[in-house]
Swiss-Prot record:
GO BP, sorted A to Z: positive regulation of synoviocyte proliferation
Main localization, broad class: nucleus
Domain of life: Eukaryota
Cellular localisation: Nucleus
Lineage, uppermost ranks: Eukaryota, Metazoa, Chordata, Craniata, Vertebrata
Gene encoding the protein: saal1
Protein name, entry field: Protein saal1
Amino acid sequence: MDRNPSPPSSDDEEAPEDDSIGDTVYSKHWFFSTLTRLIEEVSGGESSAEQETETAVDLDEELESEICKVWDMSMNQDVALFLQEFKAPEILLGIIVKSKCCRLTEICVGILGNMSCFQEPCLTISNNESLGEVALLLLSDPDPPTLLETSRLLLTCLSQAEVAGTWAERFRKHPSVRDNLCFIMYSSTNVDLLLKVGQLLDRLFDMDEDLMLSWIQRDFRESNSVTDNAEDTAAPLEMVPCLLEATKLLRSESPKGLDTYLHILHLLTTTQIGTQAIVQSPDGGEEMWEFLSDLTCNDLCQPNDPPLVVQEQKSLLSSVLAVLSTMFVSQEKQRQRRERTLPLISSLSRVLENLEECQKKCSEDKAHESPDVRQDDFYLQVVKDVSCEFLSNILSELSKDDILQGISLGHITEQRCLCALRNLLPLYSQSVSSFLVALGEADRTLADTLQRETSVLAE
């Protein structure tokens, strides 16, 4: 069955008037009957299952149809509250623990995920310690649909302020969760699952920096332990390579997923430990740099795109450029990489040129300013700040030979240099001065033109 069937209509069964749940047409009696049948089905098969191996079993088609209706209906708040009152979380927990059927586990976790969208049921679910333990253990389940629903349940609970701390504490107490999430990111090709796991990690790291750092630091400890103790011991999966693997897969499959994982990488670079994890990887961050550079130069803000593309890509741009900028100033191999930063000069200049066009349009539309417009202005300013900082660092490191090559390849032009001056001055005057000195050795005419422009901008 590829999708959940629609809920039964009110004509499916005659029921007393007071049998309805809240203001819905759903029958309490029908819920009682369905859940009771489900309990009997699981309990009835338990004794025989104990005598056999842990072989997965199929779910009865008719019963699957009925509990899928419960799954659909649990998105209704009245139904979710009724299920809470009926002790459904405890019932579903018991079924999940006993279940030998992947589809049944998926549906039960899905019902809990729907219920957790509402405050009171979410509180009940979150305060159930046994349920919390089982939910985290399910992240090691081999069934992708079950993993998807489990990730959705955890993300929904983490998004509820009243219980987010409870769940964060559970994550801290279960280091195996990190390993399971890394395994999913590194090995799964399921786009929906990777997106949900990314959203879960993004939420978790954003709300709990200490947890993020502890998971990253564990990579350093385990890497040293494997190196020192056993040549034949398989190295544990590290967080950064796993994040990169998922990001690469989602690049062409899910813009939303790509945005999510880039934001996680951005969160890492806001800390020294996170930055070290990226730039001190075995390859010195080469694979990460190559991927992010290629993404910037070939996917984002392309020459034929309209200027407003920066508004659509503002989140992607702010994250990817922030990570690249941090890597650039943090890596020992920076000077060896200068030649490969030349295409980034073109990309950064294009971003700044498009931002200038957007700012002109925003100025013209000031009379119609709204909260959404002001929010756009804020995020566009973030993109500008990150772009300027990164560009200033690149320009300040260029040598005469780098500039000559940049000119010959078309990455350094008068138009792009003028755009850089308009945006970098006066804040990055030292970087501009350093660039102009090197430029003077490579192209005196262009350097003189820019020097005059610098004087005008300084006035």
